[in-house]
C-alpha cells in the first residue's frame, strides 16, 4: 500500500507479530479467521570484530598492543549493556492504524514496529496515543486534552478572547511538538480541521443526516464531528480494539445478529481473555473517536462497558422496558377544594388509541399541551421535555414524535426561565409506573407499593445547585451510576440521599495522552490511575 502517495510503504511489523481486523474472535458462526503467531523479538548484541581496528596503527603498536585488547573489551561490554535513549518508555505508548481495505484495518504498537516510519507514513496513519488509564486518543482529541497551566491561564485572563485562544494554541502546540520528539514521532499533523462543506444545525451540532459514517458490511456508526481527514482523526476506527499482552492489535466490528446479540459484554470479554490471556485489554470506541478501556469505563460508571457494547448494534439496556415512550400530564388540575390534583402522566400512545377524539388527544395533535409532555430518552431510563430531547438527540426525537403522533414543533417551544423553574418545582418528586400511566407515588395504595421495585420508580432530578431540571431518571439508574438521590425524593422514598453514592470512589485522574515532559509548570507526581495502568 502506498501510504504517502510518493513512496512505497514497507512492512512495519516485526516478523510473526499478529495484527488484523477481526482476529479469531468469532462474531459469526462461519469461518474462523486464524491470527498470526505470537510476537517474537530477536535480541541482537552489538560486538566489535577483533579485526576491525588496524593493529599496525602506530597508536596501538608495540608495547601498547595489550591496551588495544583491553579497550576493545571495555567498549564491547559497554555497548552490549548500554540502554538506548527512551528505553524506559512504554512499547505501547502509541499505536499506528492503517486502513487496508473496506472495513479492514491494521494496527501496530510502537514496540512491534519493524522500522521507524517516515514522516509521511506517520501522517498517513491514525496515530493513537495512550493515556494513564489505558485509553487511546486520535490526534485531534489528544491535542484537545493538553492542559494549560493555571498560572498561564491567569496571566492571560485579561486579554481579548482571540489573543487568549492564540496563546493557548501556541502553548499546546509547543507541548505537542516536544512530546512527539520524546516519542520519536516525526509526523506531527493534528488533523483537527473539520469538513467545511458540512453545515451545523442551529445548536452548532451536526444535523442528524451528517452524524454517521457508513461501513460496507456493518451498518452506520454515529460520530460527533466531521473531519476533513476522517481516518487520521479516528472517525473510521472499528468498534472494538483488542491489545494482547504482547501488544498485538486486533479490531472487531459488531453487527446485527452476531454471536453476541443480546449478550452481555462480560461474555465477549471472557472469550477474548480466554484466547489471548487475562491481561488482554479491550478498548471500546466512543462517538468522539476515543478508544476507551473497558476497565476505565467501569471504574466511572458500573455497567457502562456493556451499554456501549450494546449501542454498537442498537441494543437497549433499559432497566424497565414497560415505560411509555411519551406521556402527557393530566394532573395539576383544580380538585374542587382549592388545590390541584396530583401528577398523572398518561401514555400518549394509549390516549391516541383509546380516545383519539378526546379534547386531550386533539390538543396534542395541534401541538398544544407541549409543556405537559415528557419523552423517553434513547437509553430508556430518563424522561425529558420535547425541547430538551430535540436538542440532545434530534434523530431519536424525530423518530419518537412520528411514532406516537405528536408534532415536531413541540421541540421548539419553551417558557421563560422563571416560568420554567416554577413549573419544575410543582412536579412530583417521585413517580411510579402503573400500567399505561405514571402516578405520583402518594396515589398508590400500601398494597400496590409492596410490589414496586427500583425499576418501576423515577425521581425528579436536580442539578448541582439543587434546582429541578425538568427531567426524571429511573431509581435503578441512580443505583447503577452510584448517584446521590435528590433530598426531596429520598425523603419520599424513606431512604438516605447517599444510599447509592456513599460507596463510590472517584478514580484518580489519569495522566493525559500528551503532556509536557519538561514539567516546567507542573511538578506534582501522579499516583497510579485506574487498574495501575
Curated annotation (Swiss-Prot):
Subunit structure: Forms heterodimers with the chaperone protein virE1 that prevent virE2 anarchic homopolymerization. Interacts with A.thaliana VIP1 that mediates its translocation to the host nucleus, and with host (e.g. A.thaliana and N.benthamiana) VIP2 that promotes T-DNA integration into the host genome. Forms a complex made of VirE2, host VIP1 and VIP2, and single-stranded DNA (ssDNA). Forms a complex made of virE2 and host (e.g. A.thaliana) proteins VIP1 and VBF.
Compartment annotation: Secreted; Host nucleus
Name this protein carries in UniProt: Single-strand DNA-binding protein
InterPro entries given in the database record: VirE2
Ranges of compositional bias, category Low complexity: 53-63
GO cellular component: extracellular region; host cell nucleus
Stretch list, region Disordered: 1-67, 504-533
GO terms assigned for molecular function: DNA binding
Biological-process GO terms, alphabetical: DNA-mediated transformation
Induction or repression: Targeted to degradation by the host proteasome by VBF and Agrobacterium virF in SCF(VBF) and SCF(COI1) E3 ubiquitin ligase complexes after mediating T-DNA translocation to the nucleus.
Biased composition (Basic and acidic residues): 1-10, 515-525
Taxonomic placement: Bacteria, Pseudomonadati, Pseudomonadota, Alphaproteobacteria, Hyphomicrobiales
Function: Involved in DNA transformation; mediates the nuclear uptake of single-stranded DNA copies of the transferred DNA (T-DNA) element. Binds single-stranded but not double-stranded DNA regardless of nucleotide sequence composition.
Keyword terms of this UniProt record: Crown gall tumor, DNA-binding, Host nucleus, Plasmid, Secreted, Virulence
Biased composition range(s): Polar residues: 16-42
